[in-house]
């Protein structure tokens, strides 16, 4: 089997059988079976996901991570390997991430069998990147405590960059992602007796207006921030004063101070609702993913790896506003995360992440494995000096 046949077969199987965050049971079995066939030892610290390990000719250990979960999206691609799971799709490319790491495991096992693997390697097939914070769950479960990991590397496919280009950036490359929720509780009445109630309709309208102005009036316009209102509702009938209201959304920023400003303003908005509308209002925050921080000390390995794998390196001036739970790995070791271009206009592979038409050429997965291998060589050369 050629490497192109390998990545095509595995990627398309995974694409046809996507599973949501924390439900990647069959995906986990598939990866485990692959590792069993290779004779690569592994552990399963959580119900889903796999941590594999190979010993090399060194005391140094590095790690590579691929996320394995999918999204609740109905696939609209008209391809033979279209998702067979209703309203679940690998719309963020994690099937590709997983397959590229599988190929790299296979290469490393071949090196290890010949006594030529230069470093110890931890291969992280991580569950629940989209929701659930799988990286943090693994860390809290002690999955890496026995591995003296010195560096962690990861990638993400990027359909807005042409195939063959890779976006890198030192320090923050993705934003933090924090969810917020407003809960409003008033008093219902018939619309004809509106004065007898305390309407959450007008109160929610006030909240929407004020939240919508936070970015304009309280944050530095030169910085890239998002205060997004994703879902809101109030009331149940057209002739009733709404007794409840609800708003939820997300905050994206790569500046901790800006996040605190947004939280403070939302708290003030919540407090103002009681005074203006006699409606109880509470805002709650759910801390999501911190910014992904790329350690500048690892840049030389990343750049060497990309150039030697014949990628064009693009240095991004500002971070993406995506949330990415790879950020948690910086708690255990220096880490570096890059975005690999997969755009192919000739084939119509142009739609963004989290869309129903996301697709890419499987051949790019071989080049990602090449990049992983070149990082291994670069890191080994420095450690041997």
UniProtKB/Swiss-Prot annotation:
Keywords, sorted A to Z: Hydrolase
Keyword match Hydrolase: yes
Keyword set includes Coiled coil: no
Pfam family, one: Peptidase_M20
EC number: 3.-.-.-
GO terms of molecular function: hydrolase activity
InterPro entries according to UniProt: Amidohydrolase (IPR017439), Bact_exopeptidase_dim_dom (IPR036264), Peptidase_M20 (IPR002933), Peptidase_M20_dimer (IPR011650)
NCBIfam families associated with the record: amidohydrolases (TIGR01891)
Family: Belongs to the peptidase M20 family.
Stated name of the protein: Uncharacterized hydrolase SSP1352
Species annotation: Staphylococcus saprophyticus subsp. saprophyticus (strain ATCC 15305 / DSM 20229 / NCIMB 8711 / NCTC 7292 / S-41)
